[in-house]
Design a protein with these regions (language model features):
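Exposed beta-sheet edge and beta->alpha loop/turn motif
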Residues: 88-114
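Short coil/turn motifs at secondary-structure junctions
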Residues: 86-90, 116, 126-128
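Low-complexity, intrinsically disordered terminal/linker segments enriched in charged
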Residues: 120-145
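Short, low-complexity N-terminal intrinsically disordered segments enriched in polar/charged residues
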Residues: 1-35, 139-145
Length: 145
């Protein structure tokens, strides 16, 4: 597939992810995620069904999430995107009870595309920044008394 076609697939994934966060309909992602998807993210299970469960849980924790695509670069069968998401922490997330905090987090993804679907996805979110904004990890210069 041409680079522009692959970029369109990733753009569609981002649109569908927004739908998942709003509605919980993870099966909508089957349009762009291959059944044999391999997902790479620190601490995350690598298979499609586990990834879908994670996205559903994420949507419950951050139901007002909005995604802003900052950059997208394609070459060969890979598409890289850098995005920023903003959301309010309204439900449990990774064992952290809702804080009501408004978050801004950046992520970079590398996606490998074959036959019109994402077959492999590497995610590198700013987990330290996320945990600091949730109050799970102190920000630099902050200390517990």
């Amino acid at each position: 597939m041409a680079a522009e076609e692959n970029k369109a697939i990733l753009q569609r994934f981002n649109e569908l992810a927004g739908e998942v966060f709003r509605t919980g309909n993870v099966d909508a992602l089957d349009e762009v995620l291959a059944p044999e998807l391999v997902y790479h993210q620190p601490g995350a299970p690598p298979d499609l069904e586990s990834y879908k469960r994670f996205l559903a849980m994420f949507g419950l924790a951050f139901p007002d999430v909005s995604l802003t695509l900052e950059d997208m670069i394609a070459e060969g069968d890979k598409v890289v995107d850098r995005l920023t998401w903003q959301a309010t922490h309204q439900g449990p997330f990774m064992g952290i009870p809702p804080t009501g905090n408004r978050l801004t987090v950046t992520e970079i993804h590398i996606n490998r595309i074959a036959e019109g679907r994402i077959v492999e996805r590497w995610a590198q979110p700013d987990l330290l920044g996320l945990m600091q904004q949730l109050g799970a990890v102190p920000a630099p210069g902050q200390h517990d008394s």
